[in-house]
Amino acid sequence: RCAAFALDCFTAWSRGLDEQSTPEGNPLPPRRVVTLRLRAEQRRAIVIGDVHGCAAELQALLAKCGYERGRDVIVCAGDVVNKGPSSVDVVRFLRAEGAFAVRGNHEEAALAFATGAGDARSKLIAEQWSWTAELSRDDLAWLTALPFAIALPQHNAIVVHAGLVPGVALEDQLLKDLVSMRGLVPRPCS
C-alpha cells in the first residue's frame, strides 16, 4: 500500500502536479500543451531544434530557409538557450519575432538557476549559467510560459523537446519524458 502511494506521488511529481511545479521546481506554464493553427496569411511553420544560444547561426538558418516575418512562424523544439555565446539574444530575438517554443531541459535548468528554484544553484556550474543574470523579467516570463508541447494540427504534428511515449495520450505524458527523454528502450537491470 505504501509502495502504491509512493508511486502515485512520484507520478504526480513527474507530471509536475505537486504544488504546480516541474520536477526542477519551476512553475508550470499556463498551458502544458499549446495548439498552433496557422492563419491564412501564414505559409509555413519553420521548426528548429536545439539552438543552444547561437543567435548568429539561428539567423543564418532562417535566412537560408527564406524566412519572412509575418508569413512564416518560427517554432523551436526546446533548448534555445545555453552552451552558445548569446542565449539572451536568442530569447529576445524569438520574443520579438513572436516565435513559439517548447520548454526543454536547458530552459528548465536556466529558469531554476535564475530564480533559485529547487536546489539548482548547488547542482549547476555557476559559470555555465551566469548569463541568466542578464535575463529581464519579460525574458523570464517568456521562458516560464513556454509549454511542454505544441500541436500543429494542420501538419498532423506535435513538437516536444525530447520524446513522447507511444500509446500514451498527450495530456498524460510525463513532463520528464517531454523535456529530457533519452530513449524508448528500457535499460537492462544491472
What residue spans do the PLM features occupy?
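Active-site neighborhood of divalent metal-dependent phosphoester bond hydrolases
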Residues: 87-190
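N-terminal active-site segment of His-dependent metallophosphoesterases
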Residues: 2-92, 97
